[in-house]
Amino acid sequence: MVDEYLTADDFAGLSRGGLAEACLACSARLSPAFAAFATHSGPRDYDDLVRDLWACAGREVGARESEEFERRMEAFPEVGCDDSYLLDYYAMSVMGIPLEALHVLAGGGVERALACSRTALRLANEFSEKLDDENELWDAERQEQLRVIAGLKAGRHPTFDSCLASPVSRRLVEVLPAIVATQRAEQDEYLARIRHQE
């Protein structure tokens, strides 16, 4: 499946703003996952962050503004959770997508755009593994990334809301409740074992 990651050639011809919009589109499509897994942040917190980043597309984000966005991301309680048994771990993983988008806005170029694309695809793959068709979300996310890039090259700009209406986001909304319920049960069992050991 690694061979199916996007390459620099896929992004060729996009302006800095186009690269940023492609990355922000990934951030928006995975928004339902953050809302489903986050146990502390409100459901709109992530969306507001991505929308504010999107407002910067088309211009370079300076060092000071970039640091302000990074501090804002670091303030999310889920950030820093590195225990894959916990729900917050998956919310933290989603946050990696807008972080890469921020780096693109700050002038990170194609390499950061590729990192953003791969982060989104890895998450889609992780969720796909919990479904009967292990490639379903991966394939849908990959096709959506390519569709958005093609649209940008043709002068069509995605919006946060158009990304939420994508097949990927709609499918996530359908399958996430069951995935989260399973993960929550594993989390509760894990935490119970820890309490028992104490």
Task: Name what the model sees in each region.
Residues 148-198:
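Charge-dense, extended regions
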Residues 2-154, 159:
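Structured binding/interaction patches within domain cores
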